[in-house]
Design a protein with these regions (language model features):
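Hydrophobic alpha-helical segments, chiefly the membrane-spanning helices
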Residues: 7-8, 13-299
Length: 299
């Protein structure tokens, strides 16, 4: 009887280990699938955005600064708004700051390694100063560790003004550069919209799938919840920006690659913190002036 029990116990243990290993394997498989989804989502978004820009007669840089950057910032928006609604102010602001640090320090760096990025004059004269200005504005308004509803409204109004200026900016006749000349139009403008919409959906779903499975793998490896949050979740919400900018660089679309990063950093502060602050005034001592100074410096 004892032998039968030991055999049964051994059988159960063996199958438990087998199932555990299968579970690990499935998480790795889903992680790889999420990367594939991110790649093709970015491919569709960049293709649709570039074609739409050429069809509308506007610079792909403007598309990168608006449609692409706003779309790829959706994960940060969802996380920060949920955090604000739950009274988790530190998470709401930390998510935005962490994403902005990641965008410039990692995404722009990797994109430049993939393909040397050409910086347009508009970026240096308008968009980069706006990005630095929004970082400085956040630093000043957050010196008291609070973002009131009035201050949040100021963020949103500044963003609206910036977007309106971008879209109604005089379309000066210019020499078409090599990058824009190589852009291929899709068969119809509706396909551009479809590519952009499906690309954004794939990016949001792919980044969520990546975070979930990467977190499970990290837990099995013994990583703490705090460490997972500071690394995997923070990087995970920036996966759409990373995938889009890297694919844009591979396709030699410097304007979209850079515009996506600069636009996302502007959008993260002005819109995400603006909306989160309107829903629930933000107050936390966990984010200090050094974080704000670092944001200005890296911008």
């Amino acid at each position: 009887m004892k032998g039968v029990f030991l055999s049964f116990a051994s059988y159960c243990y063996t199958h438990f280990i087998f199932l555990y290993e299968i579970s690990d394997l499935m998480e790795i498989i889903w992680l790889l699938i999420s990367l594939v989804i991110l790649y093709y989502g970015a491919e569709g978004l960049v293709t649709g955005a570039a074609s739409l820009a050429k069809r509308m007669g506007i610079s792909p840089l403007v598309i990168g600064l608006t449609i692409v950057s706003i779309g790829t910032s959706m994960p940060e928006l969802i996380v920060s708004v949920k955090a604000a609604m739950n009274g988790q102010s530190a998470l709401s602001i930390g998510n935005v700051l962490g994403s902005n640090f990641f965008n410039i320090g990692i995404i722009l760096g990797i994109s430049a390694i993939v393909y040397p990025l050409v910086v347009k004059k508009q970026l240096l004269r308008l968009d980069v100063p706006v990005m630095i200005g929004t970082a400085f504005l956040f630093f000043v308004l957050f010196l008291d560790h609070k973002i009131s509803r009035v201050e949040a409204l100021i963020f949103v109004l500044i963003l609206i003004s910036y977007l309106v200026y971008l879209l109604i900016m005089p379309r000066r006749k210019k020499v078409v550069d090599a990058e824009e000349d190589e852009i291929r139009l899709t068969r119809h403008w509706a396909l551009d919209i479809l590519f952009i919409a499906l690309g954004l959906l794939a990016l949001v779903y792919g980044s969520d799938l990546l975070v979930v499975n990467a977190s499970l793998i990290a837990e099995r490896l013994g990583m703490s919840e705090a460490m997972i949050g500071l690394t995997i979740v923070a990087a995970g919400t920036s996966m759409p920006e990373l995938a889009t900018s890297v694919v844009a660089a591979l396709k030699k679309r410097s304007d979209i690659a850079i515009g996506n990063v600069v636009g996302s950093n502007i959008f993260n502060i002005l819109f995400i913190l603006g909306v989160a602050g309107l829903i629930q005034p933000i107050s936390t001592p966990q984010i200090n002036y050094l974080d704000g100074l670092f944001l200005i410096g890296i911008s």
